[in-house]
Structures are given as C-alpha cells and as structure tokens.
Amino acid sequence: MLKEFQEFISKGNVMDLAVGVIIGAAFGKIVDSLVNDIIMPVIGAIFGGLDFNNYFVGLSSAVNATSLADAKKQGAVFAYGSFITVALNFVILAFIIFLMVKAVNNLRRRLEREKPATPAAPPPADVALLTEIRDLLARR
C-alpha cells in the first residue's frame, strides 16, 4: 500500500498540482496585500478616508460601536465592507489568472504555427512494393 501511494505521489500530475497549489497560495497573499495595502486605501481616501473593512450594519439595536471589531462583540453585524474587499481580491485574482492562461494559450498557438511540418512517414514496404508493381504494369 505504501508503494502504491509512493507511485501515485511521484506521478507528474500530482506533483504539478502540488506546486500549483503552493504557488497559488503565495500568489493569493500577494493579491491580498495589493488590495488591502494599495487599492483599498486609495478607494477609502476617495470615499472619505474610511477603511472599507470597517463598513458594517448592525443587525440589532444593541450594536452601536464605530469599529467592526467592537460591533461584533456587541452583536450580529452585516460586514459588507469586508465582503467588498474579498470580492475585489477575487476579481483581481481571477483577472490575473485569465491573463496568464491567455498568454500561455497564445504561446502554444504561436509554437504550433512555427513548428515545421513533419514529413509524411514512408509507406510500409508491402504498400511500396505493390505501388511499384502497379506502376510497372501501367507502363506495359
């Protein structure tokens, strides 16, 4: 059983998937930082200097705090600012992945166009012999 597992893990597809997951997780952190540290502060400055992560609506009258962390301690909240930030993360990540896939597809198409045409394989010996016999008979 251990040998089967080792064979499964050593297959190329599994290793490629593992590398993809690790790189994807690291790339996700980069996108999170881009959105949280660069894009959202600019958007927040445009809309009055507020942090989007602190945009919320209290779902009960007991919630009267001004920060999301304090509001969550007081009761249920609808934290739409956090959702906006996460949705923006997703859109940026999806767009970057789209651009990467598009670039890879374009590269594959270009390589296929530039690939020289492979010469046709010679016919099998019996077919070549029959063709030669046919040609000799046609000349008579």
Curated annotation (Swiss-Prot):
One GO term describing the cellular component: plasma membrane
Protein's cellular compartments: Cell inner membrane
Family matches, as Pfam families: MscL (PF01741)
Alphabetical list of NCBIfam families matching this protein: mscL, PRK00567.1-4, PRK13952.1
Subunit structure comment from the entry: Homopentamer.
Family of this protein: Belongs to the MscL family.
Name of the protein this chain belongs to: Large-conductance mechanosensitive channel 2
